[in-house]
Amino acid sequence: MIAPFCKRLLLSCLAVLVTAGTALAADVTITAKTPDELQQKLLEAAKNKVKKVRIAPGVIRGGATGRDHLLFLKGLQDMEIDAAGVTLAGTDPTKGGVFLRDCRRVTLRGLLYYNEVPPFTQGRVLKFDEKQSTLEVEIDAGYPAPDADSVGYLFDPETRRWKPGVYDIYYNKVFKRSGRVYGIRVNADMPAKLKTDLTPGRDLIAIRGKQGKMAITFDVCEGCRLEKVTIKSAGVFGVQESGGNGGNYYNYTLTYGPRPKGASSDPLISSVADAFHSGGALKGPTLEGCVLEGMCDDAVPIHSSYALVVQAAGRKLYYVARRNANQFKPGMRIRLFDPEQRFLAEAVVKTTGKAERDFRLPHLPADKLVYYRLESDRDLPVIPAGARLSTPDTAGRGFVVRNCVIRNHRARGFLIKADDGLIENNLVEGSTIAGLIATPQFGWNESCYSRNLTIRNNIFRNTAYSTGVTKPDSYVPGAFSIKSDAPSKGPAGYGHRNIRIIGNTFENQDGMNMHLDNVQDILIEGNRFIRPHRNPCDRGRARGYNPDALIFVDNAERVTFRDNRVEAPGPYLKKLLEIGKNTADITGAGDGIVIQKER
């Protein structure tokens, strides 16, 4: 039998243990009604080195005083922010959501973020005056006026998805008519396109806003985690990571927001631009279990950036890059490409620093750029001025995208420019330009070609059907492409290398299903092509591509086809494999792709 005193002591100890257990589960619980109040309390918790913060469930609503984002969190380390049941509602569409800078091992969990006022607009096209190059658009109730110049997208009123077979609509001036009706003057090249694309009185239109900011940003961060977060009505990207050591983890949903106040129609889009965007990270991101839909641009782009070579001799290079953006450090690998995007050489950086002379190229803005010098570990071949310099070590190498759903959006499901990546078990459906493209983009200054990719067990369905890519002059001939950024000028080394495309399903895709260009050591094995070429398609025909072929290979070496099959092909499939110029060692061209006989 326990004495009363001992019993009280035991109960007291148990209470301490329970309290301690609670403290370990949530060191601090904070309440807030506005973003300003929440920001102050989170920074105070970080200053006090609190490891776990629980935000009390509820709606935190308002703008941001003296900053561009509702929350700006800098320098946090080893901190968990549990926001389950919390809604962060922005009232100013020009403000971003959560911005984390220079953070290490920070977890944000359970938050719902959205803009109450959409950072875009939408309505119905009433008519088109071809002589005046002017659309007349009635903006839906509850949505803002269109910006003075931007880009719009046509939507099918029945499916409320991007209208098939049309171009984006670029415009440069807006006139207020009456009520919610506006005149929108389109660019000079648009009237001829709209003659065939537009159905006045029926077509819906969504128009990008230009004043918004990122929903969630990880800037120069490392080892951070975004878990069970939902984003709606994003101002630019849903999630952005920029620079830093990287290795961040993402599990989130980007989807359509609620109807704004006074509206009678649901939003047509979920974000103004990309669902996710990674640029300049040393270690690539991991995206797992994400649902990304309704965005106006790519779902998952991963890249670094180029520098411009101004002079080269022996082991020394001079190059120009943006101010405060010299990404090349000793020990990093570098790759060089000629002005026509052909691979020239690779090496390792020994030393780098500011150039001892200022080249001052007259066509480049001196106030935004800095000239640097670099010494490599080996002699380089002749490198022409205007060549591009990149490193795979700041392009998100080692990225993983697994078990994600990407659907019903403009542009590309994946836009990959990184090495050592894994893309597996994803569903990509309704991407208007392509399900996946691996390519550098010299015009956007985004690097580079990819090496050592594995793309397996994914489903690509109903992609490459709008945004101009169905036209004969399309610059994207394939619904799935590993390619150069421009038509190749001939072999001078291969950009893409060692890529495995295994066990994927390509379903309901018209035109060329797969395009391989500027590639070496590629394996295409065990893929299924279901119901291809059911409808006529001229995608890329005017540029010399054959959209009647299932797969097109050009400028390639050591490409292997094995155990790929075509099921229920449509009447417009005329050729399984077309082999273009500058190819060698193509294995399985005869029996590596076969049409499966119906039982």
What is each of the regions a protein language model found here?
Residues 115-116, 124-128, 138-179, 323-362:
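Ser/Thr/Gly-rich low-complexity blocks that favor extended beta-strand/coil architectures
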Residues 64-67, 91-97, 117-121, 213-215, ...:
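Short glycine/acidic-rich loop motifs that flank beta-strands on beta-rich extracellular proteins
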Residues 51, 69, 77-79, 86, ...:
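The right-handed parallel beta-helix/beta-solenoid scaffold, focusing on the short coil/turn
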Residues 168-212, 354-399, 407:
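Small/polar beta-strand repeat architecture
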Residues 26-54:
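Acidic Gly/Asp/Thr-rich repetitive segments characteristic of extracellular carbohydrate-active
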Residues 27-36, 60-63, 77-101, 107-121, ...:
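Right-handed parallel beta-helix/beta-spiral solenoid domain characteristic of secreted/periplasmic
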Residues 39-46, 61-80, 89-109, 117-133, ...:
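Extracellular beta-strand-rich solenoid/capping regions of secreted or surface-exposed proteins
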